[in-house]
Amino acid sequence: MDRDEFIITVYCLVCEQYQVIKNTYFLRRGGFAPALSDEEVLTLEVCGEYFKLATDKDLFTYFRTHYAHFFPHLRDRTLFVRQAANLWQVKAAIQYRLTQVSGQATDPVQIIDTLPLPVCGYTRSGRDRCFKPFADYGHCAAKKLDYYGFKLGLRITRCGMITACPLLPARPHDIQLLDDLVAGFVGLVPADKGFIDTFRQTVLAERHGVFVITAPRKRMTTAHSPGLLKACARLRKGVETVGSHLTERFAVARLRVHDLWHFQHRLIRKILAHTVGVFLNLQLRRPPLDLDGLVTL
């Protein structure tokens, strides 16, 4: 589909889901109704993220210039940004509903990983006042990166749809965050070696029905068959692909805001945009993680 078709498709999808959840959240207590509808704002955000418009200014300018005929009431950037931020709960609810209606939330095999989320340059971290006391120093062994900020937890299905994305502290080792990543899930969980903890894995399996499968370290024995380990290693490539999407296409590691509330709002927006892309690919019977091929430029 081309860009026009994509925008219309996203708008129809947003309207369908918004009608279901709009009575759950008290969005505004009084005053005049905004000129731009909530459905239009959500569509602008999702499409803007997909088009790699990382900042509110870029997003507003692009659609004001090229799609004023689609969104004739898009006139004031400040009002648009404020309205978008106030819809953070709606965005989270729509993202959750898409995992439900697509059937992906019940996938018995879901893969976990974490991503570093720096909030500023490492050398500026000592002077940061925006995220104290929430942000902290962390280390990403895979990227050999020391950073100041948070971790983004990821749990995805075999198709690549994100079913859980908790915002986690940066300092603890991944294994200490395992309970947050598998909360509410029962099934098989392929993970990397950073999640190896025999005692914790045994407790999760016996008490909660969560079977965390990790590749063994050198000279480490394992009860898992080579076939299972090979299958889990193949599945882990999916979470690495999703991590690359979020880092490169959706720029989650370059969120430059001044407080935790706006940080979470921007993060939820990017997660929703990724989920919409995977959802549409599934509907069109395309490779779920082929986001580049979804829209022809």
Which residues are covered by each model-predicted region?
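Short alpha-helical elements
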Residues: M1-L297
